[in-house]
Amino acid sequence: MTAPLNPSAPITVEVALGDRGYDIVIGRGGIESLGRRITALRPGARTAIVTDRSVAKHWLPRAQASLDETGIAHSTIVVEEGEVSKSYAGLQQVCEALIEAKIERNDLVIALGGGVVGDLAGFASSIVRRGLDFVQVPTSLLAQVDSSVGGKTGINSPHGKNLVGAFHQPVLVIADTAVLDTLSPRQFRAGYAEVVKYGALGDSGFFAWLEANHAEIVRGGAAREHAIATSCRAKAGVVARDERETGERALLNLGHTFGHALEAATGFSDRLFHGEGVAIGMVLAAEFSAERGMMPAQDATRLSHHLTAAGLPTRMQDIAGFKQEGLADADSLMALMAQDKKVKRGRLTFILMEAIGRAVIANDVEPAPVRDFLHRKLAES
């Protein structure tokens, strides 16, 4: 691993997609630079800020002030906080508001918020006037290291998570690390699961660094910015090689097949944050891999131990209300996984593991062993 980067200067990570490439700018004070960066990127553009009620209280005034200082016209669209907005109704609200604001194809949409806002605003941008450019200003750790990068946008369906959407790359990502200071501990932990994912799937050295430096990452400063930049570089590299997820990019879904099914089973509610579902999903994927003889059992245990040490759930029994409200049975979870975006010709595709730092795409997994595995895991005390 390289030494942590100097937090006093912004870190720039390039997403190399030719004429559709863009920069991820990481560092404190990014929101204050929003107006200046947009002026340089798109002189004369008007903007529409899409945000949620919670983010609006903390960060909308700073974003608006930055735009005002550079004379950029702006309107604001505020949606409800949480997955409830990542819906057909939420999409209609944002699309109609963009049309009413007369945002044109030479203007910019600004997604100021976490993963829900970024996915929603990005998808609306992809379809209004057959395509508006947008800027991601992610305000959660999860969004900064994952959902704001790579162009996946969309909403949920009653049938499952992220089933309606489009690939639509942003033109700029501004990851202001100062906003992370206002996250609740639970929100920060949920985002940290996605950071761990990058080490687990492709960088054993980064995983070991996370084990040694987790406390420093929580405290902030150079270690936190290094973790974010390393995660963004990992994702940017994969996206540049496989933008449309025809191969390698599927590895970034480690933990997501199980995790998305658990999110759907809990009604996309606050019982289980997305990152928490990914944490449980990664452990399930690792343990299933170990049972198949693909991965040393001690590596699966090591992954589980680090996530537990970070305060994340690692078992389905850790989901809020599991004992009182229960959870879907194995057959119901299998039905939810059958709606996964990675299903091809009706066959499940899993991201499994051979070791810490080495994930693989498995297209040959029969449903019966997965169902039996889930049944046993659900029955654990």
Swiss-Prot record:
Top-level lineage group: Bacteria
UniProt-annotated location(s): Cytoplasm
Catalysed transformations (reactions): 7-phospho-2-dehydro-3-deoxy-D-arabino-heptonate = 3-dehydroquinate + phosphate
Residues given in the record as Zn(2+) binding sites: 194, 256, 274
Cofactor note: Binds 1 divalent metal cation per subunit. Can use either Co(2+) or Zn(2+).
Keyword rRNA processing: no
Binding-site positions, NAD(+): 81-86, 115-119, 139-140, 152, 161
Keywords: Amino-acid biosynthesis, Aromatic amino acid biosynthesis, Cobalt, Cytoplasm, Lyase, Metal-binding, NAD, Nucleotide-binding, Zinc
PANTHER family in alphabetical order: 3-DEHYDROQUINATE SYNTHASE, 3-DEHYDROQUINATE SYNTHASE, CHLOROPLASTIC
Protein name: 3-dehydroquinate synthase
Organism: Rhodopseudomonas palustris (strain BisA53)
Lineage of the species this protein comes from: Bacteria, Pseudomonadati, Pseudomonadota, Alphaproteobacteria, Hyphomicrobiales
Gene, per the UniProt record: aroB
